[in-house]
Regions:
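C-terminal binding/interaction regions
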Residues: 92-117
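N-terminal presequence-like segments and adjacent domain-start helices
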Residues: 1-7
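N-terminal first-folded block
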Residues: 8-40
Length: 117
């Protein structure tokens, strides 16, 4: 029988993968008690558009390898470089520039969630 990974396991694996690929300040927040549309946020600081594209490809490859589905991918800025969101259902990945991360401060906004990393 195949080993079924929990949403938390997947969030932590994605976070580690991002950190291994030079994303900075990678955090995982359990927001399952705060909303009805996702369980975990993975938040990471990116350095450039090229860095974002590489990380997004890795996340998409992870999703495919783990029989998951991407629900939505959004660019949250006109340039598309400041905040990129990949929604895979129970996990939402936020890839943000340092400026966007400081400005939006998702960790503070979702302070009621349990920080796992």
């Amino acid at each position: 029988m195949a080993d079924v990974k929990s949403a938390q396991d997947k969030a932590m694996e994605i976070a580690q993968m991002l950190e291994d690929s030079k994303a900075e300040n990678v955090s995982v927040i359990d927001v399952s008690e705060l909303n009805s549309w996702t369980d975990y946020f993975v938040i990471a600081t990116i350095h450039s558009s090229a860095h974002w594209q590489g990380l997004a490809k890795q996340v998409k490859d992870y999703v495919k390898e783990n029989d998951m589905e991407i629900h939505v991918t959004h660019n949250k800025a006109a340039s598309g470089d400041d905040w990129n969101l990949i929604d895979i259902g129970s996990v939402v990945v936020h890839l943000m520039s340092a400026d966007a991360r400081e400005f939006y401060d998702l960790e503070k906004l979702w302070h009621g969630g349990k920080k796992l990393r």
